[in-house]
């Protein structure tokens, strides 16, 4: 596959040989070796022809029977949020915490290291995994930290819990009205409990000490290291500014301009930060982006989360039939913003979990007319409860999707038994139905909502197995190669980057990963247990699990 190099051609910077190369090109080509030069794939072929290209300065990576695939493209993640969670003084997740009292103990321990009045942040709490089966309140946190404001962020990012000191700092009282698109939870006397729902969480964020570019840059570098460890070479940051506002953009540009961020970033600015959008005249994308960072998309959040009962459903929640969730923007306003962004040249990515929200998003996109030729590839994020009729409309209108496939494993049991009931739950992330209609879609982990590993997401798409070991909608499973494409070439398509990344083809970026085994050849149940052994970006080995075997690199 590929012509032998002529003698005058410069030696490649990298040669990879001795294993299996899954190119994921249109023909499903396989090879045993490849060469990269100047950051791009230069040759693909057999061991003998590729080895002959190596020169004195060539890095030679011996696969020793392992498998190379294109670098994973994460089509929906939150690197700043992820990095802040990694650096946070309180890990509020489950595991390690079984009860709210365990989280309170961690807050108490952290408070010993903070001066009076300093903010203590925690991330990843999940009420659905706690034995208490509820959100913490200020009454749980106050004894652990009476002098320090505390803010715990839910694993979904759709809720926060503040202690009394934090509520005082921002001035939230019984008289504070609920903000548009959010709610302040209150007790029977009307006093805030500390739980802040959806946009209400932004009220506390505004009172916290501002996070400057340096702090956010450090968080991004923490996330960057974890991405490389898991074979992620490109990330769609779907919500730049959600954590640090405009300072996030400054942090990205600072890092990428200095070459200190190795993962390639395709950014979607949070819509509230775009000048002119509220007035219907948004600024257009800035074409001047530093190498490794592109931002020509805007993120809008239409509803909340199913497990938080804020995802907007056409039929009520199984556990509370009168509850339908909430829209964070009214449908008419959502459509108005979509139209204004499209006219200004932006790609639009709208978060939609509940089917009522998905209806509103499709309506907004459908009003734009035929999408052919614009190249903007407007998207629905998560698209969790899409019905068959909605998938028909998505196909008709050229609407793409990024499916949060790991919902099946992490929350599938509760979706079936608590939130959605068996019939709706078996259809979450309907990949097979979407694929049968030719809908373009990627797969994602929404980190830090779920752990990074794309191999786990690929397994979820193939196995449709919940955390209790039960199958959930096995008819919506897809095959291994299709799932691999959902984390590579099909994810690249969502950002309009399929011509430069997502498959191993001559001329494309040399973004590659080495897997311990061929995921298309092992028992599907083992896919999530495979390891990423090395990550290559632009032809450079940027991470490896263990030293390359003797003679394997020089």
Features from the language model and the residues they span:
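Beta-rich accessory regions
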Residues: 534, 538-540, 545-546, 552
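Divalent metal-binding segments
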Residues: 9-17, 22, 26-280, 300, ...
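A generic structural signal for residues embedded in beta-strands
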Residues: 43-44, 122, 512-515, 544
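Bacterial Sec-dependent signal peptides at the C-terminal "C-region" and cleavage site
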Residues: 1-9
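Non-cysteine beta-strand/loop elements that form the S-adenosyl-L-methionine
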Residues: 78, 290-310, 399-409
């Amino acid at each position: 596959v590929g012509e032998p190099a002529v003698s005058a051609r410069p030696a490649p910077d990298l040669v990879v040989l001795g294993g299996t190369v899954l190119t994921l090109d249109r023909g499903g080509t396989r090879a045993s070796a490849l060469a990269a030069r100047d950051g791009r794939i230069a040759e693909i072929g057999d061991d003998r022809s590729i080895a002959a290209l190596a020169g004195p300065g060539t890095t030679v990576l011996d696969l020793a029977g392992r498998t190379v695939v294109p670098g994973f493209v994460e089509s929906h993640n939150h690197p700043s949020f992820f990095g802040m969670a990694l650096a946070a003084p309180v890990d509020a997740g489950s595991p390690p915490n079984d009860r709210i009292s365990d989280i309170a103990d961690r807050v108490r321990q952290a408070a010993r290291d903070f001066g009076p009045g300093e903010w203590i942040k925690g991330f990843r709490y999940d009420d659905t995994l706690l034995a208490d089966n509820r959100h913490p309140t200020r009454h749980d946190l106050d004894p652990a930290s009476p002098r320090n404001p505390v803010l715990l962020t839910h694993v979904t990012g759709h809720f926060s819990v503040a202690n009394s000191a934090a509520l005082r700092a921002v001035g939230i009282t019984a008289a504070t009205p609920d903000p548009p698109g959010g709610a302040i939870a209150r007790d029977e006397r009307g006093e805030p409990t500390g739980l802040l729902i959806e946009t209400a969480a932004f009220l506390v964020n505004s009172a916290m000490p501002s996070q400057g570019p340096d702090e956010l840059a450090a968080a991004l570098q923490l996330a960057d290291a974890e991405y490389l460890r898991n074979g992620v070479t490109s990330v769609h940051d779907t919500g730049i500014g959600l954590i640090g506002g405009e300072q996030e953009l400054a942090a990205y540009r600072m890092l990428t301009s200095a070459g200190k961020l190795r993962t390639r970033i395709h950014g979607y600015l949070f819509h509230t930060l775009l000048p002119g959008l509220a007035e219907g005249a948004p600024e257009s994308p800035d074409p001047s982006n530093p190498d490794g960072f592109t931002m020509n998309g805007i993120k809008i959040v239409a509803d909340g989360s199913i497990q938080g009962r804020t995802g907007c459903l056409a039929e009520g929640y199984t556990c509370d039939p009168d509850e339908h969730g909430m829209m964070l923007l009214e449908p008419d306003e959502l459509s108005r913003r979509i139209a204004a962004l499209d006219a200004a040249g932006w790609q639009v990515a709208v978060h939609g979990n509940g089917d009522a929200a998905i209806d509103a998003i499709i309506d907004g996109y459908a009003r734009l007319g035929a999408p052919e030729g614009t190249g903007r590839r407007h998207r629905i994020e998560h698209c969790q409860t899409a019905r068959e009729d909605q998938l028909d409309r998505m196909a008709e209108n050229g609407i793409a999707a990024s499916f949060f496939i790991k919902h099946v494993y992490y929350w599938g049991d509760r979706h079936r038994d608590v939130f959605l009931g068996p019939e709706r739950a078996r259809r979450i992330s309907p990949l097979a139905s979407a694929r049968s209609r030719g809908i373009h879609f990627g797969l994602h982990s929404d980190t830090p909502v779920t752990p990074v590993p794309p191999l786990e997401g690929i397994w979820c798409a193939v196995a449709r197995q919940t955390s209790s070991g039960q199958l959930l909608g096995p008819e919506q499973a897809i095959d291994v190669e299709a799932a691999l494409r959902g984390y590579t070439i099909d994810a690249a398509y969502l950002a309009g980057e399929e011509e430069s990344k997502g498959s191993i083809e001559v001329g494309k970026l040399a973004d590659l990963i080495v897997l311990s085994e061929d995921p298309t050849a092992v028992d599907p149940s083992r896919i999530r247990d495979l390891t990423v052994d090395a990550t290559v970006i632009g032809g450079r080995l940027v991470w490896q699990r263990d030293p390359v075997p003797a003679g394997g690199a020089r």
